A protein has these predicted regions:
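Transmembrane helical elements of multi-pass membrane transporters/channels
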Residues: 18-37, 141, 175, 208-212, ...
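N-terminal transmembrane alpha-helices
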Residues: 7-47, 60-75, 79, 104-111, ...
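Helix-terminus/linker motif at the lipid-water interface of multi-pass membrane proteins
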Residues: 28, 32-53, 122-129, 185-196, ...
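Small-residue hotspots at the loop-to-helix junctions and early N-terminal turns
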Residues: 49-60, 135, 139, 273-288, ...
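Transmembrane alpha-helix boundary and packing residues in multipass membrane permease domains
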Residues: 23, 27, 39, 78, ...
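Short runs within selected transmembrane alpha-helices of multi-pass transporters and secretion channels
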Residues: 73, 142-160, 168-176, 201-216, ...
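Short alpha-helical transmembrane segments in multi-pass integral membrane proteins
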Residues: 1-20, 80-147, 193-248, 304-368, ...
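Small-residue-rich hydrophobic transmembrane alpha-helices
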Residues: 52-112, 149-168, 278-340, 372-386, ...
Length: 455
């Protein structure tokens, strides 16, 4: 009741800050995993350049595993919360049980890919035998022990569905801390632990994920008393699975587009391993900045959706205004830091031969952060106002329809020696500006059809 009253009465600007800060911190924490691995790997005594390239090539598969796990979790979260609200305890238990059954299936697919598909995947992006070997080692470990990230994603959403999101954040923090502690120990070899190089980075990552998953499993079993826990509820129910993916599939697609974009960009940049590495390193820095916008978006959506349910035109308009304003405020420091201190990031990653490309990419692509952040906010606004199609179109424009053909065309001029690699980096700001203009048109249409008609 207090939560509902807060959503009704608290000034929107204060409410957005109060709801947004924990979500922003949570999203930023997710980005830490990728940056930490690359920073430690980049400072290996030997083979650091090849290892950084390998991490760049495996990243799309890591994102895809997260996409499927989170998308399944999102569908479970929404369906479970609705079912509990209806007081249907038996169905709630089936929803939770079926989500765990789906987790087992997802893990089985990842396991099979880890055993049989990794070599072909890595080899499609490079011919460097050292990079191929390191990429196979890293990705095989991440896939074979992927049950950690998969079940963490599911238990996180099961806890959020019952209002216990604090415990999922605790699990994230524990996993990040475990990863950060183990990275130098397992990569470089400290004490009785032998030097494992890129394999050590993979083991540190999956151990952190497993630690998070185990902790959230304990929280789920101990705290989610609204849900009956029994293996019998894991028996697959086609109706429930359809309901889960009716909600979760768009989230999987949105996340998977990021994975596809990075993979295709790696193919476009295949002519230059150093450019590939530079792009991969920059993408991880970019994720950290844009995840701030994603975190705020997760506050924008429920605030505007609640106001839309109340038919409160003023609170909807305030939600849009402050959502866009706060997003811009978050993006400005990100642009400033990446524009003025690219050398510091290059040193952190020990970028080596890719240093020049990395600094160039950072200075050019970071121009797009402002427009990218606004696009993310637009998507949160659309989703709150039943504009799922508009949100999907923006994702397609940003990560598929504009960026990949444009980068591909620019790469022809680069490979022919007519222009430098920097031309390819300009595809990103151009894409975000065009997408932002399209997003503004969508917002005007939604405002006219959904908001202005309210009394």
């Amino acid at each position: 009741m207090a939560e509902s009253n807060k959503m009704k009465k608290m000034p929107v600007n204060k409410l957005m800050v109060q709801m947004g800060i924990p979500m922003i911190l949570s999203m930023a924490l997710q980005a830490v995993y990728n940056i930490v691995d690359s920073a430690f790997v980049g400072n290996m005594r030997t083979g650091s350049e090849a290892a950084l390239n390998a991490l760049t090539l495996v990243f799309p598969v890591q994102m895809l595993m997260v996409a499927v796990g989170i998308g399944t979790g999102v569908g479970t979260n929404a369906l479970l919360a609705r079912t509990l609200g209806q007081g249907n305890g038996k169905k709630a238990a089936k929803v939770a049980g079926n989500s765990l059954f789906l987790g087992v299936i997802i893990y089985a697919v990842c396991l099979l890919f880890g055993i049989f598909g990794v070599r072909a995947y890595i080899s499609s992006q490079t011919i460097d035998t050292e990079v191929i070997s390191m990429g196979i080692d890293y990705l095989r470990i991440c896939c074979v022990i992927s049950f950690g990230i998969i079940f963490f994603s599911l238990f996180e959403k099961l806890l959020q569905a019952t209002g216990r999101s604090l415990y999922s954040t605790i699990g994230q923090i524990v996993g990040a801390v475990v990863n950060i502690i183990l990275d130098p120990i397992m990569i470089y070899g400290i004490g009785p632990v032998p030097e494992m190089g890129v394999k050590g980075a993979a083991y540190a990552t999956v151990i952190g994920q497993v630690a998070s998953a185990i902790l959230l499993f304990v929280f789920h079993m101990k705290l989610n008393r609204e849900i009956e826990h029994d293996v019998k509820y894991m028996k697959p129910d086609s109706g429930i699975i359809k309901e889960i993916y009716a909600i979760g599939f768009p989230a999987i697609i949105a996340q998977a587009l990021m994975s596809i974009m990075v993979y295709v960009m790696n193919l476009i940049l295949k002519f230059s391993p150093s450019a590939q590495t530079a792009y991969g390193l920059f993408y991880k820095v970019q994720q950290f900045v844009l995840f701030l916008a994603f975190g705020l978006r997760d506050a924008i959506t429920p605030i505007i959706a609640f106001a839309y349910g109340m038919r409160s035109k003023k609170r909807i308009q305030d939600g849009i205004r402050y959502g866009l304003l706060y997003t811009i405020v978050l993006m400005i420091p990100g642009i400033a830091i990446t524009e003025f201190f690219p050398g510091a990031f290059a040193t952190l990653f020990n970028a080596g031969q890719s240093r020049e490309y990395f600094i160039e990419a950072m200075r050019i692509i970071s121009i797009s952060f402002l427009f990218a952040g606004i696009n993310v906010a637009y998507q949160g606004i659309y989703q709150a106002l039943d504009g799922g199609i508009e949100s999907l179109v923006i994702s397609l424009l940003r990560q598929l329809i504009i960026i990949l053909p444009l980068a591909g065309i620019f790469s022809v001029f680069v490979r022919n020696g007519q222009m430098g690699v920097s031309l390819i980096w300009w595809a990103f700001p151009i894409t975000e500006v065009i997408s932002c203009l399209a997003g503004y048109v969508f917002l005007k249409r939604i405002r006219k059809n959904k908001i202005d008609v309210l009394n």
